Regions:
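N-terminal Rossmann-like NAD(P) cofactor-binding subdomain of oxidoreductases
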Residues: 2-232
């Protein structure tokens, strides 16, 4: 049996990080990941023990989730200490942009560390499209090189499926992009879409896609039995 790949999830306190930790914990090739949080994140431990934060059942095995590990502060040395070979970033766009650049300049990626980024930091290669994120890279050349090297992580399509296994940096697609691409790809391949008439995608998602930060807009009383449009002219 092949040795399990040691993984880590940075941003394990968020919805994406929680779900990712659950999937990794049940995967036969990975097992429970190292759970990490940024030092700027605060974790409430009231009502829990052994360093397992209350309200985060994936860190204590509650809720039938097979991950039992406290969330630790992130550091590059912690990754090396635990022998992590694959790091998942469930962090904001700007944070992912900064961290991957640090990993490259610090030599971790050249020493074998691979990164899968769940944000939009590395998805778009065309500069005019990346402009919507307003990135301000401290190391512009390294960031540009990483942008070119990043592989779009949609394995259902070629050549992505062939590139992902050996990629040092994988840019995980967003939810809307995934749903639209997977629906359109076979239709386009079969020549069933009239591109001259354009394509309109009417997409909707659950409110959890907005993240766990509480706002009046995402409060239960605002979203229950309701529907609203957001970022109509600036969605990324």
């Amino acid at each position: 049996m092949a040795a399990k790949l040691k993984t880590a999830v940075l941003g394990a306190t968020g919805y994406s990080g929680l779900e990712l930790a659950r999937l990794l914990g049940r995967h036969p090739r990975t097992g429970a990941p190292l759970l990490l949080r940024r030092t700027a994140e605060t974790v409430t431990k009231t009502g829990d023990t052994d360093g397992h934060p209350a309200g985060l059942p994936h860190t204590s095995g509650n809720g039938n989730l097979p991950v039992q590990a406290p969330i630790q502060p992130f550091s590059w040395s912690a990754l090396e200490q635990h022998g992590v070979g694959l790091l998942f970033l469930a962090t904001p766009h700007s944070v992912s942009r900064e961290l991957v650049t640090e990993a490259m300049t610090g030599g971790l990626m050249t020493r074998g560390l691979r990164i899968v980024d769940l944000s939009g930091a590395w998805r778009l290669k065309q500069e005019q499209h990346r402009a919507v994120y307003g990135f301000k890279d401290a190391n512009a050349q390294t960031a540009a090189d990483l942008t070119e090297r990043a592989v779009y992580g949609l394995p259902e399509l070629k050549p992505n499926a062939d590139q992902i296994p050996s990629a040092a940096l994988v840019a995980n697609p967003g939810c809307y992009a995934t749903s639209v691409i997977l629906a359109l790809a076979p239709l386009l391949a079969a020549g069933m879409v009239d591109l001259d008439r354009g394509i309109i995608s009417d997409s909707k998602s659950g409110v959890s896609g907005a993240g766990k930060e509480p706002t009046a807009r995402t409060h239960f009383v605002s979203v229950a039995d309701n529907f609203s449009a957001y970022s109509v002219f600036g969605h990324r």
